[in-house]
Regions:
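Flexible, acidic glycine-rich loops studded with aromatic residues
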Residues: 144-250
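Glycine-enriched alpha-helix->loop->beta-strand junction motifs that scaffold or abut catalytic
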Residues: 27, 44-55
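Generic structural signal for well-ordered alpha-helices
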Residues: 16-23, 45, 66, 70, ...
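Conserved, mostly hydrophobic/aromatic
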Residues: 2, 33, 48, 181, ...
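Aromatic/hydrophobic pocket-lining residues that form the small-molecule binding cavity
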Residues: 15, 41, 66, 121, ...
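Catalytic alpha/beta core domains of metabolic enzymes, predominantly
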Residues: 53-183
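Active-site beta->alpha loop and helix N-cap motifs at the rims of alpha/beta catalytic domains
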Residues: 1-44
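Short catalytic-loop micro-motif centered on adjacent basic/acidic residues
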Residues: 31-35, 55-59, 221
Length: 262
């Protein structure tokens, strides 16, 4: 995957133009372009899918945010079919997990620590499986469309008191993808355990989310906050990268000038 500039997170037209540029320059069918699932990113995702650009939707934190980009993906595919174009355009929707618990643990009693991210994931998986079973999607699949896969992101455990394979065990779910840090991968290979696969009906997600709300966490507002903070963090990293490249260029230019003088 290669991301559009995070400076475009609130710029629909700019995101579309950047996605087209990356796709054209990359010239690889397996190159996914990252577009954040912000309100401004959603229409850009639909348009990019319509244009045949594989998209990795980033910065999703809630079921509602996931459903918005799932809808955008299907609209893009439907438009391709109406235009007589190939409906096979790849996409993944990346739901960030561990940041929920980092943000909420301090507000919750011990028995609810590290429960919010998993519950949101269960709730979102239920919506994902309902989408796959819907007549609307079945019609698209029959025409040759590929499902937009739900991807579990940020699955490294941040809480030192929790299992280092917590989110890997919890997110064993058919038809999904789990991206994990190398350290977490090795930990699971060494001592990880599975206790079955995720329930398609959401399991105990609704009950857990109700308890967390009762404890004082505004889950809907927190989802918006996490997405905004995630976008801001991406911008900070982007500037750091550009500053590093500029500094390296200055160093190389200095060495080149020195070589000429000698």
């Amino acid at each position: 995957s290669m991301e559009v500039s995070p400076l475009l997170a609130a710029d629909t037209a700019g995101s579309i133009a950047a996605a087209r540029h990356i796709h054209h320059k990359g010239r690889r069918d397996n190159l996914f372009v990252k577009i954040p699932g912000t309100p401004e990113g959603v229409p850009a995702i639909e348009e990019a899918i319509f244009l045949g650009i594989p998209i990795n939707v980033t910065l999703l934190f809630s079921c509602a945010q996931y459903e918005a980009v799932s809808e955008a993906y299907m609209r893009g595919i439907e438009r391709r079919l109406q235009a007589g174009l190939d409906p096979r355009v790849g996409s993944v929707a990346s739901l960030f997990i561990s940041r929920w618990d980092v943000a909420s643990n301090k507000q919750l009693p011990d028995e609810l620590h590290n429960k919010l991210g998993i519950a949101v994931g269960q709730q979102t998986y239920r919506a994902y499986r309902q989408m796959l079973a819907s007549p609307r999607w079945q019609k698209l699949a029959a025409a040759g469309a590929m499902p937009q896969r739900l991807l579990w992101a940020s699955t490294g455990t941040k809480d030192p008191d929790a299992s280092d394979t917590l989110y890997i065990s919890a997110f064993a779910a058919p038809e999904t993808i789990n991206t994990m840090p190398e350290k977490t991968l090795h930990a699971f290979a060494d001592h990880g355990e599975l206790h079955g696969v995720m329930d398609v009906d959401g399991g105990d997600a609704d009950a857990v989310l109700a308890r967390i709300r009762a404890a004082g966490v505004d889950i809907d507002q927190l989802a918006l906050t996490l997405q905004r903070e995630g976008a801001e963090a991406f911008v900070k990293s982007w500037h750091h990268l550009l500053d590093g490249i500029a500094e390296k260029a200055r160093q190389l230019a200095g060495k080149s000038d020195g070589a000429v003088l000698k």
